[in-house]
Structure formats: C-alpha cells, structure tokens
C-alpha cells in the first residue's frame, strides 16, 4: 500500500468532520500513503495549519451555481495533476463536487480512480434546501464506488436511494488524558454549582443540537431546592436566542462559551445531557462515556449505537417532558447514576479508536481500488 495516492475532499466544515478528515490524513501519511487534501481555505487554517498537502478549493456551504461550477473545474484540474487512486469526499456537497470533477476527467480512462463518500449528517428536509440535498444524495448514491455513513439510519437511506456498496464509518473521539483533581475542582467552582447539582451540555449553539429543548426542560426544575445549575459550553448562531430564552424563563444557568477544558467540565458535572435532534457519532457522547459520566441523550442517529441501552438514559428528541424526567431520575437516584457511570466506562473501553478507524479506511481504499487486501 506504500505510495498509494489518496485525495480527501471536504466542504465547509465545523468540528467533528474536519477533525475526522485530519485524523484520516495523518494516519494515512503515517502508513505510507501519498495524501492530498482539497477544501475551503477556512478548513485548511482550522484543521491543516501549515500542511503542504492541503490545497484550497472553495466548496460553498450552500448551493451556489457559479461557485459550485468553479469548484468542480478547479478540483478536476488538481486531480488531473495528482491522479489519485482513491478520492475520499466527506459530506454530500463535497461528494457531489468530487463526482462531477471525476466525471469529466479524461485521465480516468487510463488510470482507475475510485470515489468514496462519507455521509456525516442528515440532510435538511425543508424546502428549498431539502430539494437540493435530495438531488445531491442521489448523485452520491449512484456515482460513488462506496458510501460510508456515520449512523445506521443514513446507511439505510443511501441503500434505499440505490447505493450498492454502503457501510458504517468509524468516527472516534481523539485520545485524551484525564484531568487532574485540581483542574476538576476549578471547573466545578467555575460552574457555580456549590451545593447544587450541575447539568452540563456541550456543543455548537445551532438548531440541530436541540438546546432550546434543554432550556425548556430546565425551566421545569427551577422550583427544586437545591435546584440544578445548567451549564452550556459552546458558541454558535443561536447564542443570543438561547440567552433570551434563559432570561425569559428565569433559568439558573451559565453560558460558558467555547471551552478548551471540556474533559474537566465533564468530570465536574453530575449529569451530561445531549439533547440533539440528530447526531452521527458525536464526540461529546464518546467523551462523556470515557469520563464515566451519567448521560442523558436523544435516541436518534448513531447515539444508541455508541451508548447501547445501559450507558445512557435515551429519550425521544424534542420531548421536553421525557428529558425532564430522565435528568431528574439520574439526579434523584444515586444508584442509577453509579450504574450509568460504570456502564459508560465499560462502553468507552469497547469503542474503536483512531487506529481502527484508519485501518478500516485503508482497507476500503484497497478494495475499491482493486488492490489485494491483507488477510
């Protein structure tokens, strides 16, 4: 496999997708692959700073005909120069751009190049974006040699659309070190939870994350004494809306902003809540399991595959009453909290890590490129 040429393509990304591509690129290079990464300059600065293997291609975050056409033409020229054996695109927009770039590549008639697409997110359904993404899904399903998905529901959807070779991607949380006791104590003090239980949520302040549902749930437990403190770590477009919701409801909470000490925050919390409308293999769930924290999360996407039925209390997404009941059950029952913590650590120990993710990707590259795979 040494010297096998792999091109990664990504669009406008935040958080997990960019980190995942960077992990695969590093792992591939460490195993002797010749790697190139194509994507927006913003992604390069955030996830590939100073990497000579990164080449800017501006793939827009929403449909823009002129920019999309320019991205296809630029990527086609770049791929003609590097002639990869496998192109691995991440996301539906990047997958469609890569498919069109390869469709017009004359060099593919002489040099085989396979297309792999990883679907990281559930597409929007509301029009007009939903109609556009439905087309992108079909392009990916019919033109990719293989499709990997971050959850079983996405994989089933791609099979339904006609994709012939569909599997599950492995998207592990990066390895981390446990915070020290002093760091945890400082985090706990900063959460304002002296004498009160702390409910923690972490994520981008965006509609998908379901934080408006969490704040509605928090309004229901304000009458309790000692009432829980809700701490929300993250930044994003809904910041002001969520602050207004908290003020209007009189919620006892702390907006923490973007934080670099999430492991300490997790260790300081009494319960971690992931109220998302949909998720694939969210890093925060994996990090909470690794920290052994009692977890309440939405039963959606790939979350149940990560937690199983014993390492989290799973509730329907958007169900305020169920979320309230689950959080209070954990806070009021030390035995339940202890069982969740023990199951979380066991579950985390069984989850595949970065080496497994890279090995699985490389085995897929060999297969779609028609190369012999190791037995």
Model-found features: residue ranges?
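A conserved mid-protein helix/loop that constitutes part of the nucleotide-sugar donor-binding site
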Residues: 18-26, 197, 201-220, 230, ...
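Aromatic "clamp/platform" in nucleotide-sugar-dependent glycosyltransferases that forms part
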Residues: 258, 277
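Short His-centered aromatic/hydrophobic patch
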Residues: 89-95, 119
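Short hydrophobic beta-strand element within catalytic cores of glycosyltransferases
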Residues: 294-297
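N-terminal strand-loop element at the rim of the active site
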Residues: 3, 7-69, 78, 157, ...
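Conserved acidic donor-binding segment of nucleotide-sugar-dependent glycosyltransferases
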Residues: 309-321, 329-335
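A short, active-site helix/loop in glycosyltransferases that binds the activated sugar's phosphate group
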Residues: 142-167
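A charged, aromatic-enriched C-terminal amphipathic alpha-helix characteristic of glycosyltransferases
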Residues: 335-366
């Amino acid at each position: 496999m040494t010297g096998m040429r792999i091109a990664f393509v990504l669009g406008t990304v935040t958080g997990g997708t960019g980190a995942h591509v960077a992990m695969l690129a590093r792992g591939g290079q460490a195993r002797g692959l010749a790697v190139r990464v194509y994507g927006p300059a913003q992604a390069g600065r955030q996830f590939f700073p100073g990497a000579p293997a990164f080449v800017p291609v501006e793939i827009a975050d929403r449909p823009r005909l002129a920019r999309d056409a320019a991205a296809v033409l630029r990527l086609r020229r770049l791929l003609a120069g590097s002639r990869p054996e496998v192109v691995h695109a991440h996301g539906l927009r990047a997958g469609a751009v890569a498919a069109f770039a390869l469709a017009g590549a004359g060099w593919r008639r002489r040099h085989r190049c396979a297309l792999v697409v990883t679907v990281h997110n559930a597409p929007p359904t509301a029009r007009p974006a939903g109609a556009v993404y439905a087309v992108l899904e079909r392009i990916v399903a019919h033109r990719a040699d293989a499709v990997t998905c971050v959850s079983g529901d996405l994989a089933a959807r791609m099979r339904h659309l006609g994709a012939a070779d569909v599997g599950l991607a492995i998207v592990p949380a990066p390895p981390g070190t446990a915070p020290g006791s002093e760091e945890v104590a400082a985090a706990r003090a900063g959460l304002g939870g002296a004498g009160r239980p702390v409910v923690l949520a972490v994520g981008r302040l965006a509609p998908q994350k379901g934080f408006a549902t969490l704040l509605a749930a928090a309004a229901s437990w304000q009458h309790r004494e000692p009432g829980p403190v809700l701490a929300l770590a993250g930044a994003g477009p809904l910041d002001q809306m969520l602050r207004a919701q908290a003020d209007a409801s009189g919620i006892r909470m702390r907006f923490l902003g973007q934080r670099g000490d999430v492991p300490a925050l997790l260790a300081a919390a009494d319960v971690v809540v992931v109220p998302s409308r949909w998720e694939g293999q969210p890093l925060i769930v994996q990090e909470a399991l690794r920290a052994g924290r009692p977890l309440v999360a939405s039963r959606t996407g790939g979350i149940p595959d990560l937690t199983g039925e014993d390492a989290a209390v799973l509730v329907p997404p958007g169900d305020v009453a169920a979320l309230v009941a689950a959080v209070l059950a954990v806070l009021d029952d030390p035995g339940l909290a202890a069982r969740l913590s023990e199951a979380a650590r066991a579950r985390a120990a069984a989850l595949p890590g970065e080496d497994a993710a890279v090995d699985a990707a490389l085995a897929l590259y060999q297969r779609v490129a028609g190369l012999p795979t190791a037995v």
